[in-house]
Amino acid sequence: VSFTLDRRSFLAASALAAAAASRPAQARELTDRQLEGIYVIMQTPFHESLEIDEDSLRRECDFLVKCRVHGMVWPAGAGETTSLSHAERLQFSKVIVDEVRGRTPVFIGVHGANKFEAMEYARYAEKIGADGLHAMGPSDDSSDAEMLTEYFTAIASVSKLPLSIQESTPGMTTDFFLRLGEKLPTFRIAKIESANPPHEISRLVGAGRHLIPSTGGGGVNLINEMSRNSGGTMAGAGFADLQVDIWNLYHAGKHAEARKVFEKFLMMAVLERETGFVLQKEILRRRGGVFKNVVMRRTRKFTMDREDLAELDAIMEGAKPYFRV
């Protein structure tokens, strides 16, 4: 625990490069501690017509706030970002920022086909009062280190908001993140998606830099990662309240209690690996009708079968005592 406090003290001592920049009145300066924790990747709800369901999206925002998430991210991979149009990303980014109203940090996904599109998203995110930016690599999946550096540098050049970067191509290694962190002061969160995220977290933490290591992977390694002094995870929305409890209990020194909740969460995370992101939508549908349906934009086929649904029944029954909403 003392090592965790030492790292956080180090983080707190390094001011964000964005602190000196002017921001829209509705934006806030995030402390280093506020950049850590459970930053949920929001799901994107659709009507049967495949248009985005704004009412359900707003309910998801409120649901996540009530789950006490440390932050939320939209759009990103779990939010079917590649299926969204340019106009939709602009319109519904503002819907989310307006709905959340500063109750928890909102990071807007700014990745694009190229640096010019990404720069436009980044400018817009700051204009509407987002708290941070989240970026994957360019949509051509470039792994060229020079091109990737140019792309992320361009994003950082048009906004002083803290930047979260998600590993999304083979060229985005831990070494790449460390080099990029030296170059871009606003690059604060490195989201690791490699085959062995816990080991890469240890490498990032051991380097003693200002980067905060976060992970994807559905949160399946969360306890292991926290033991290595991770800065959080970015998983789906369905069991957000359990994720928050795991994080908060662990960092309060209640490791056994955190593991007990994690065991309930892990059963869902394992099922998601087989069923895909549709599971998150099914959970949100069941949890008080946050979503009205489970429509995915890429397929009309419902990919969960009877046995999957029965397994989810049992998982949700076991997790119910930990639901906040």
What are these regions (language model features)?
Residues 11-14, 41, 226-230, 237-325:
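C-terminal alpha-helical cap/extension of soluble enzyme domains
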Residues 91, 95-99, 124-128, 154, ...:
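Alpha-helical structural signal in soluble globular domains
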Residues 22-54:
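C-terminal segment of N-terminal export signals and the immediately downstream linker at the start
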Residues 37-39, 71, 105-107, 132, ...:
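Structural preference for beta-strand elements that scaffold enzyme active sites
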Residues 169-265, 269-273:
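Catalytic alpha/beta core domains of metabolic enzymes, predominantly
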Residues 57, 89, 93, 118, ...:
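A general structural signal for well-ordered alpha-helical segments in protein cores
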Residues 1-17:
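N-terminal secretory signal peptides and thylakoid transit peptides that target proteins
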Residues 32, 46, 51-168:
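Active-site beta->alpha loop and helix N-cap motifs at the rims of alpha/beta catalytic domains
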